[in-house]
Amino acid sequence: MNIILSTFIFGMGDDFSIFIMEGLLYKYKTGKKLLDPHKTAIFFSAFTMIVGIGALVFARHPALHSIAIITILGMFAVVLVAYTAEPVIFNAFVTKPTSQGRPPFTLWAILRNIVFYIPPVLGSAFILLLSFVAMLVPAKKSSRQAAIGWMLHRACRILVGYAAFIHPKRIGPDGELIRSWNGEAGVIVANHQSSLDIIMILATFPKVKFMVADWVLTSPLFGVISRFLGYYSRSEGYEKSLERLRVDVADGWCLAVFPEGTRSLNGKIKRFHKGAFYLASQVGVPVIPVVFYGNWRIAPKNQGFNMTEGIAVTEVMAPVSTISAEYHELTVRISSLVKAEYAELCRKYDSPVNPYFRKALVSSYIYKGPVTEWYVKVKTKMEDSYSFFHSVLPREGRITDIGCGMGQMDFMLSMYCPERRIIGIDYDADKIAVAQNSWLLKNLPDLEFRCGNASECELPESNAFVISDMLHYLDPQAQEALIRRCAEKLLPGGMILVRDSDSENAKGQKVTALSEVFSTRILAFNRTQGELNFISHSRMETIASTVGLKMTVRSNDAVTSNTFYILKF
C-alpha cells in the first residue's frame, strides 16, 4: 500500500511541476503572470491531500499511521521541489541570461561549451607542466620561451579550428586570408571585445607577449606560463618595459596591448590610451593594428560560458611606422584607422552571411512553444534570413512594418543595422506579446512593437513602409486605402515595399492559396476576419499610379505567385 501511495504522490509531484513550468514559460513568452494562480491551485491540492489522508496520523493502527506519515512527508517534498527547485533552475538557465540580453541556455549549448573549454584547460595544464620542465633544460631562456610560445600558438589554432560554432577569418594587410603572421615584430594594438581576443592573437602570431594586469601573473594556472614567457605587467612602469621591449623585438617577439583597457560590452570601440603608442615610438618599432569583429557576440564579457555561433574576424592591418612620429598623433591616427576598418567589417558581416543573427533570432523564440519555434526556423530559412529586405530597405531612418507578426523580420533588420528605427504593427495581440518579450529587445533600443489594426491605426512618418504577406487579408477597398495612407506618410526619397501574390500568375497562385489555407484554417497560425483577397500585378500598378508612385516588380520565387512590389516617388 505504501508503494502505491508513494507512486501516486510522485505522480502528483509531476503534475505540480508541469503547472509551475507552464506558469514560468507563459510569463517568459508573453510577460503575463500565470504562476500565482497555479501556485494557489497546487497549495489547495496539497492541503486537501494532507488534511484528508494526513489526518490518519492520529490513528492507532500502524498501517494507517504509516500511510499518513508518507502522505505528509511526500506532499511537503513535492510541493517544496515545485515551489523552489524548478523556479531556481529556470531562472539560472533562462530568465537570468535573457534579462542580460543573452540567449537562454539549451542542453546542446551547455554540452558544446563544456566540450569547448575542456581542451584549453587540459592544454594549459600540459603547457604548465612543460614550462616547469623547460626551466630545467640547459638552453637559452629565449629559446625555451620560443618553444612554449610556439606550442601556445599551435594549440590556439587547433582550438579555434575545431570549435564548429566559431567561423574564424584571419585577414592580412593585403586583404587575403592568412594562416599566421610572418611579418616584422612590433607592438600589436587591438580593440578589445572578448576573452576570445587573446586566443585569436595567439592563433595568429607565433611569437607574442601580452601586457596584462597583475592578477594574471599571480593566477594559479596561467600565472606560471605568463611569468615564464615574460609577459609585461601594467604596474611595472614604462622604463622597465622599454628595456625589455627592445630585447624582445630584437628577438622577434611582438607585444600585444589592448589600448581600451577593458572589454567592450556592445562591440563599440572606446577611447585608446596612449601607453602602447608611447612604448612603440620610444623603441622605434612599428605599431601593428589588429581589428576584431564578432568576438563580443560569440563570447561576451562576463558571459563566457553562454557562447553563440558566429563569424570571428581577426584582421591584421599594415604596420604603421613610428619613426619621427609623435605618440599623441600616433594614438589618434591608429585609433581612427581601427575604427574605420571595424565599421567596414560591420557593414560586410552584419548581414545574412553571418550565422550569428539567425541563431540569435531562433534562440529568442525557443521555450515559447514548439509551433512558434518551428515556424521561425522554417520561415527564416525560406527567407534566406531576410536578405532581400535587408538589401532593398534603407540602412538608417524610420521603417514601419505593417503586419509584423511575431517580429522576426524586424529583429533581423534591426540587428543588421542598429541605425534603423523600426516600428512593427500587428493586430494579433498574442503575436505582439511574443515580440515584446524577446531578449533581443534589450539590445535594440530603436525597435518597438505595437498592437493595432492596419486599417485604423495611426501610421508614423517613415522612410520606408513594409507590407509583407498581409495585404490579401484586407478587402480591395482597404488595400488601396492602406497604400494611400502609407504614401501620405512617406518621407522624401522613401519607399513602400509590398510583398503579396500576383493572382494573374495562375500556376503559382494555386500554391500560394494552398499555403494560406494551411496557415489560416488548418494550423490557424494567422488570424483572418474575412475572405482572402489576393491582389494582381495590374491592380497593384493601378493603385501605385493612383497614389502617384512608380512601381518596379521582382518575383519572390519560382514556385509561388508571391511578388515584390517596390513603390517609390
Language-model region placement:
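Membrane-embedded transmembrane helical bundles of large multi-pass transporters/channels
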Residues: 1-111
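A transmembrane-helix-recognition feature enriched in membrane-embedded lipid enzymes
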Residues: 106-167, 224-225, 371-374, 521
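Catalytic core of membrane glycerolipid acyltransferases/transacylases, capturing the structured
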Residues: 131, 135-151, 182-237
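Non-catalytic C-terminal accessory region of glycerolipid acyltransferases
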Residues: 242-367
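Conserved alpha-helix/loop element of class I SAM-dependent methyltransferases that forms part
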Residues: 379-395
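Class I SAM-dependent methyltransferase SAM/SAH-binding core
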Residues: 408-446, 451-454
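A short glycine-rich, Lys/Arg-flanked "PGG" loop and its adjoining helix->strand segment in the class I
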Residues: 480-492
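C-terminal alpha-helical "lid/dimerization" subdomain adjacent to the S-adenosyl-L-methionine
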Residues: 499-544, 554-555
